[in-house]
Amino acid sequence: MSLPATFDLTPEDAQLLLAANTHLGARNVQVHQEPYVFNARPDGVHVINVGKTWEKLVLAARIIAAIPNPEDVVAISSRTYGQRAVLKFAAHTGATPIAGRFTPGSFTNYITRSFKEPRLVIVTDPRLDAQAIKEASYVNIPVIALTDLDSPSEFVDVAIPCNNRGKHSIGLIWYLLAREVLRLRGALVDRTQPWSIMPDLYFYRNPEEVEQVAEEAAAAEEGEEEEVKEEVTEGQAEATEWAEENADNVEW
């Protein structure tokens, strides 16, 4: 698929894709994913063609940008590593996020409270999000999916070949997808100008690590406050001693 020059993969984006291990696929290759295989390593891991990944990512972004109402786009991730990325993608593009368990009947049972009628569905893993893809096929909703080389591709209209198991790879794909959508909508005018949002914002963070960092920051603040109090106390004590000495030396 040939793209206009403005959509070409830049060296910076290629380095990001490689650094996040987006190109590392599975050992097994599904028949529909064979065109995306670049090579195979001696250990059996297949390498994904990053150029193909970028082409499909741009195609997906153009489809998303063509939806007039951003809320009609539903971003889904049952995988833990993709839930933060889905929420950030929805916050930046205006899409509707479903992070966590997908409630069966959300697309087909209009009686349920979580019923939705989207025009486009984006999933992180076709295997874990199979229920959403199946229901989308019942009501003729197109599906965009992040697919590994061994992922099933039934009822998937646009497959973005990538490593959909690593937290950095998943976060980076959602980040690049959001950035390209904003550029196509005109929110980011100049394509040469970098986006102010960093990819790290889309990466999964362990709640225990976040709590530990918060506790360390709170302990550091308490230590600084205690040091300030000690300095103030020492200063007051010195001032009191100086006043007493001067009072003794005063001759009335």
UniProtKB/Swiss-Prot annotation:
One Pfam family here: Ribosomal_S2
Region (Disordered): 213-252
Chief place where the protein resides: cytoplasm
Any one annotated GO CC term: cytosolic small ribosomal subunit
Record-linked PROSITE patterns: RIBOSOMAL_S2_1, RIBOSOMAL_S2_2
GO terms, molecular function: structural constituent of ribosome
GO biological processes: cytoplasmic translation; endonucleolytic cleavage in ITS1 to separate SSU-rRNA from 5.8S rRNA and LSU-rRNA from tricistronic rRNA transcript (SSU-rRNA, 5.8S rRNA, LSU-rRNA); endonucleolytic cleavage to generate mature 3'-end of SSU-rRNA from (SSU-rRNA, 5.8S rRNA, LSU-rRNA); ribosomal small subunit assembly; ribosomal subunit export from nucleus
Residue numbers of N-acetylserine PTMs: S2
Leftover remarks: Present with 60900 molecules/cell in log phase SD medium.
Protein name: Small ribosomal subunit protein uS2B
Organism field: Saccharomyces cerevisiae (strain ATCC 204508 / S288c) (Baker's yeast)
Species lineage: Eukaryota, Fungi, Dikarya, Ascomycota, Saccharomycotina
Gene: RPS0B
